[in-house]
């Protein structure tokens, strides 16, 4: 099994809340209740190929680092949740930049290239339809983040009021 997949399986078990469905799941339920069309930017095959693009040694190193830091994850998760809920985007970027895994070529593979592809897809979709776009927190900030890339294309990007 690939280290990235093991890591993805490990993280939910470390979260402070055991019944946490995740933001993505909650949005899916709301969309279905309101009979909204749900589309994804990528299929599973593509996502798997993204992981294959990252050298096995890098994946293994990050997995071991994660295992060695298990006790820190609860605090980091709570901090990330607070930063996300209060829309402090620059702090999200700082948190992701702490990880060696999201730096350099891995950041380009995991975030930057995918963000550019998503914005390209959005440019095709948005003129024809009203859309609600949800992406993981790491995809939001930075020069190559979805927010900045949309602004560079001339879109006005505003946060939703979080109540």
Task: Give residue spans per PLM region.
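A cross-kingdom marker for long, charged
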Residues: 105-163
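Structured, acidic catalytic/metal-binding patches in enzyme active sites
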Residues: 1-110
């Amino acid at each position: 099994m690939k280290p990235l997949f093991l890591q993805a399986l490990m993280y939910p078990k470390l979260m402070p809340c055991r019944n946490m469905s995740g933001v993505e799941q909650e949005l899916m339920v709301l969309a279905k209740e309101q009979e909204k069309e749900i589309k994804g930017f990528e299929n599973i095959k593509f996502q798997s190929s993204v992981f294959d693009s990252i050298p096995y040694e890098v994946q293994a190193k990050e997995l071991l680092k994660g295992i060695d830091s298990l006790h820190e994850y609860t605090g980091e998760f709570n901090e990330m949740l607070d930063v996300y809920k209060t829309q402090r985007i620059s702090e999200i970027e700082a948190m992701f930049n702490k990880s060696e895994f999201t730096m350099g070529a891995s950041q380009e593979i995991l975030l930057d290239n995918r963000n550019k592809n998503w914005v390209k897809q959005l440019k095709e979709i948005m003129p024809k339809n009203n859309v609600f776009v949800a992406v993981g927190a790491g995809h939001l900030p930075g020069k190559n983040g979805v927010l900045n890339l949309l602004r560079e294309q001339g879109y006005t990007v505003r946060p939703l009021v979080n109540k």
